[in-house]
């Protein structure tokens, strides 16, 4: 059959990224406590991950390659074929391998893949010991030109209490949920759980899925005794990441969903570290 995609295109324009977007696909990711975790990710293809315990999940995946000006189109089916050949074992360890295969099979100079998935941790309430699953949105994003560039991104819900409100009020202080988004480049493998714990320790308090009354008392009092601006959160996290020699680049952003204002509070730090 005639291969239309390989026909010559006369507009003489390169395409930076072309491929498949929004594939929902079951994957297995490493779980530090349980072993592997199976999850569902939304995948955009580019590549790399390791092994321990495992958790199954569903990912949303995007996979792209560049398209030179002299080709009319790319072969979309090959992206999914490459994904299927890895039999759900998409991870940081084989991310680079998948990117290399994309470049080879699609005759491309560059490849890019994004895998976004919910990651679950069974979290224990601080006093009662009640347990409940917490969901964290994670993304593995990688590109391959001459070499592989891999970024891990994690979103962590937190609770914050306003230092100014506490200082000026006779009773209580305004508090709210917030979200911290961390992106990392690194030399060796990083655990999702370790980054989540680092972030949660830098907020006024953790967020939990299950709390009994004694837990609520503990959480609200802890937040009151540990007030934080968004500026405090990003600075504290940046200090910790800056001390980690495994991290080569990071960005940290904190956003508070303000409870008494008609806007959110926001802060951002980015740092390229010397290798």
Question: Across the structure, where does each feature detected by a protein language model lie?
Answer:
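N-terminal intrinsically disordered, cationic/polar leader segments
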Residues: 1-275
